[in-house]
Swiss-Prot record:
Protein encoded by which gene: clpS
HAMAP family noted in UniProt: ClpS (MF_00302)
Family: Belongs to the ClpS family.
InterPro entries named in the record: ClpS, ClpS_core, Ribosomal_bL12_C/ClpS-like
Region Disordered, residue ranges: 1-24
Subunit structure, as described in the record: Binds to the N-terminal domain of the chaperone ClpA.
Disulfide bonds: none
Gene3D superfamilies in UniProt: 3.30.1390.10
The protein's name in its UniProt record: ATP-dependent Clp protease adapter protein ClpS
């Protein structure tokens, strides 16, 4: 007697067939950048890097010097939402402390 198959059957000739899963692309990442200015004290920049990017003193100092000598530097790479939050936090903190330090983001 022939075997009846239902339209919902996932078997074809005795072999299990998994339904196709759509490929999900990884989320885009963004670099959070600090821009150099002539007014923000270096120790404030180090504090920002430690506080908002969890860098130790040596790493924060290294990034601060990079920003100071090259005009800008990467603080970290994050998903869009995290990058947006960090940019907003740093810019607000800088303004609250009356410093012109500017934080931006760009696609990595």
């Amino acid at each position: 007697m022939p075997r009846e198959s239902s339209p919902d059957s996932h078997h074809e000739h005795g072999v299990a067939v998994e339904p196709a899963r759509p490929e999900v692309a990884p989320p885009p990442f963004y670099q959070v950048m600090l821009l150099n200015d002539d007014y923000t004290p270096m120790d404030f920049v180090v504090d920002v890097l430690q506080q908002f990017f969890t860098m130790d003193l040596d790493k924060a100092t290294q990034v601060m010097l990079h920003v100071h000598t090259r005009g800008r530097g990467v603080c970290g790479v994050f998903t869009r939402e995290v990058a947006e939050t960090k940019v907003a936090q740093v810019n607000e903190y800088s303004r609250m402390n009356q410093h012109p330090l500017l934080c931006t983001m760009e696609k990595a």
